Amino acid sequence: MLKIGSHVSFKKDTQLLGALDVALSYGSNTFMFYTGAPQNTNRVDLNPDLTEKALIKMKENNINIKDIVVHAPYIINLANGDESKYKFSINFLKQECKRCEVLGIDKLILHPGSHVGQGVEVGIKNIINALNEILPTTKTTILLETMAGKGSEVGKTIEELKEIIEGVSEKEKIGICLDTCHLSDGDYDIGDIDSILDTFEKYNLLSKIKCVHVNDSKNIKGSHKDRHENIGFGEIGFENLINVIYNKRLENIPKILETPYIEGFAPYKLEIEMIRNKKFNDKLKEEVIKIGSDKNE
C-alpha cells in the first residue's frame, strides 16, 4: 500500500490532533512534523487529551501511528566537537526522543550534523559517540537522513552513513531516511534509483531505510545546494520521483513531501493527487494558488 503524506505543523493548541486533521485534508495516510520550532528550543508541554483524541481518529481513518515520523530540530549537531554545543545537542536530542515516546511515535529523523572544519572522520566519530550515549536511553529509532553535502555536512554519501551505523552499538535503534533532493544534490542519479538501492543492499543497509523524503530539486545533480522544488518541476523530474515512490524495495515505507509552499499556499493535496494518479499536472502551481486564494476570500 502506498503510504504518502507531507510535513505538517504541530501547533500549541491542537498538537498531534491538529497535525492529523491537516494531513487528512491533504489526502494523506502518513505525515511528519517537528514537536516545536526546528530552529530553537521552545517546546510546549504535550497534551495527553489531544494525543488520545488523535490516536482514536487515526484508527478511524486506518492510519498507523507506526507510519508517523517526527523530525529532529536543525540546531542539533552531533558532529560538532565544541564541548558545550556537543553536550547541548546530546541532551536536546534525548528530550526529543522522550517527546516521541510520549506521543507514541517510534521514528525520529535526524540530520547527522556538520563537522565545522574538523574533518569528516572526526565528525563521524563524534556522531557515533553521541548516538552510543543517546540510544540506550530511549525506545525511539533514530533515522539518519541522507544529506546534500552542503558546507561540512556529514552523511552525504552512503559510505559515511555506513561508517556511522557500523560504530553504533544498539543497531536495532538506528535507521536511514532517504531524501531524493539531497541524494541528487549529493551526486546520486535518482533516475537510476535501483543502483542506489543496490549500494544500500551491498552494505546490508536496505532494511535500515524506514522513510523517504520525496522532493524535487531546484539544482542539477551534484550541486550540493539542498533547495527543494515541487514534484515534477525540478531537475529530478516527475517520472524519476514516481519510480522512487512506487519502487518495490521501498514499498510500505512512508513517503513524505517537503516541497515548498507556492505563494504561501500548501501544495500537498494536489501533489498527493498527482502522485496517486501517476500523472504529471503542469498546471499544479496555478491551481494551488487559485484554490488558496479562493479560500482566503
Sequence positions of predicted segments:
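N-terminal pre-domain/capping segments
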Residues: M1-V70, L78-Q95, N281-E297
